Amino acid sequence: MQGTVNSERLKFDAEVGKVLKLVIHSLYTNKDIFLRELISNASDACDKLRYQSLSNQDLMDAGSELKIVISVDKDKNRLYISDNGIGMNREDLINNLGTIAHSGTQKFLDAINSGASSQQGVVELIGKFGVGFYSAFMVASEVIVESCKAGESVGYQWKSSGDGEFVISQLESDQVSRGTRITLALKPEECEFVDKFRIEHIVTTYSYHINYPVYFLNDKGEEERLNSEAAIWTKAKDEISAEEHQNFFRTVAHVGGEPWMILHNKNEGVIEYTNLLYIPSIKPFDLFHPDRKCSVKLYVNKVFITEDNVQIIPQYLRFLKGIIDSSDLPLNISRETLQNNKIIEKIKRSLVKRVLSELKKKAESNIEDYTKFWDNFGSVLKEGLCESMNTEFREELISVCRFYSTHSNDSLISLEDYIERMKPEQNNIYYLTGNDLDSIKKSPQLEGFVSRGVEVLLLVDPVDDFWTNVVTDYQKVPLRSVIRADEDLEKFSDVEKGDESKDSQNEDTQSKEKVDKFIGYAAQVLNNLVSNVRVSKKLTDSPVCLAVADGSMDIRMERFLREQKQLNYKSTKILEINSKHPIISKMIDQYTENGESAMLCNMLHLLLGQACILEGEELQNVSDFAERMNSVLSQIN
């Protein structure tokens, strides 16, 4: 440290003491960021020199390297951060360090905007609020700044203990180098910050991709570089090799395999930002963990800000890995807390539209490859359908969703595919939710639809029970569950070949009067167990099924809410009976000939139990079900 003369003690601006306490004790929740802030300020200083040297070449020696050097003195518990950037004179030190939120960087940007905006592209500035420097007082009992401004020969020292005052002095030496050197007299308990590996970790985490090299001066006087040569996302797309992508993907994704899709874009519209995002080819094991956070890192001019509070990527795109870098992102006084404002929302909308657009292109061009993505992340993507959004945006999201159906066997279809195949007399998009494809394909609910060639979507992800209660239509075509009891399938064309006999079987043996009387009897027997008993218009092979009235809650959704203690009752369902099924036909004959009987009563209860089991509903009384089953079986001749 050099000697000084002409010292002058000055006070910080009004209320600075209170603000300084806020910065030290409240604003920053992570002490590591003090070094990030000081490195960012040093990078700003190098940016300023590089810019001003364009019009005044004497400010910078030809071929000299702009750099940042970190060194330590473990015996004195001191940390040093040096740069050979623009430097500061006495006036700069007082204005920029004596007044919080009086940012030299901000003033510099204003000067560019007012006079030399055509060259603004060469300047990338980080700090906008002028308080990052004061985060040094979180770890230091005293901060000393020695600086000499480019083009000047006199250097100055700024010194403060963060107690409301600072001392400004002139450096004695007439051989002062251009740039700034910051000395932190660390508090005893902050000795970890003189450890080389600790410093390297902080630089790697926060400042790995800034414009200028960051060196650590080791015990031998050798400079070891701590950061990367360049941020990969600043390169043109065609300049990044597959190997570079793979290496960077492994760094940010922490999953195996190769990226399934790479999204590298630079937006230069009203809001400028760059995104380098990857979609993995392997599903992370913790994709559905409730504490899982977004894995997209936020940078401001290549300085890492956070990945914990990024609101730019919605939860339903949490499988994205990579970075977003912008100079337009607003920050609250600290770089740690992002403002939730219109700029962030605009970036979010732009990013989401771009991601959905690329997914749609892939789905339309290569459904086999897209199926791999959908198997990994389709259920996550559908979570977005449950969120509040305008119709246009929701339909964009639905357009990239793919579904199984009764028409497609085991291949995926889009809702556009479904609508194109709808029958002329069909007004709804029909769907059925279930646990898995194998079981849902055997559901009695599908029989009438399949026999008439009406396509039904087969939805087997847990999230399907939720979004189908939010999304009511697509392209103005209503979505409708096949479990609705009032669905009339008679308007559709005759059953397909091979099924005619099923629909016509016994049609002359059962009169409507006999059926109606039996239905009335069944409703009387089952009384409080069902809300109604009716003849089914959709069953062809099964004797019975459960149904719900239009407007009632879906069976699976109601069960989920009960399990989550969000619903404290169980609604009664409608029992639909296939009057042409052999079992039901015999029961009708027996009732017509002999009237009520214990056997018929038991069989009706067993059929209701069967319908409940097929829908995943709990039996109201398992012991009663077993007793009735044994009673019926005991009468077999």
Swiss-Prot record:
Q: Which family does it belong to?
A: Belongs to the heat shock protein 90 family.
Ranges for region B: 336-559
Q: One MF term in GO for this entry?
A: ATP hydrolysis activity
UniProt cross-references to InterPro entries, sorted A to Z:
HATPase_C_sf, Heat_shock_protein_90_CS, HSP90_C, Hsp90_fam, Hsp90_N, Ribosomal_Su5_D2-typ_SF
Region entry A: which residue ranges?
1-335
**Gene that encodes it:** htpG
Tell me which CDD domains the record gives: HATPase_Hsp90-like
Task: Check the record and name the PROSITE patterns matching this protein.
Answer: HSP90
Name its species. Answer: Ehrlichia ruminantium (strain Gardel)
Function (record text): Molecular chaperone. Has ATPase activity.
Task: State where it is primarily located.
Answer: cytoplasm
- State a single Pfam family of this protein: HATPase_c_3
User: What PANTHER family has UniProt attached to this entry?
Assistant: HEAT SHOCK PROTEIN 90 FAMILY MEMBER
Q: Which NCBIfam families match?
A: PRK05218.1 (NF003555)
Where does it localize?
Cytoplasm
The organism that produces this protein has a lineage beginning with: Bacteria, Pseudomonadati, Pseudomonadota, Alphaproteobacteria, Rickettsiales
Keyword ATP-binding in annotation: yes
Q: Which UniProt keywords apply?
A: ATP-binding, Chaperone, Cytoplasm, Nucleotide-binding, Stress response
| Complex formation | Homodimer.
Q: What's this protein's name?
A: Chaperone protein HtpG
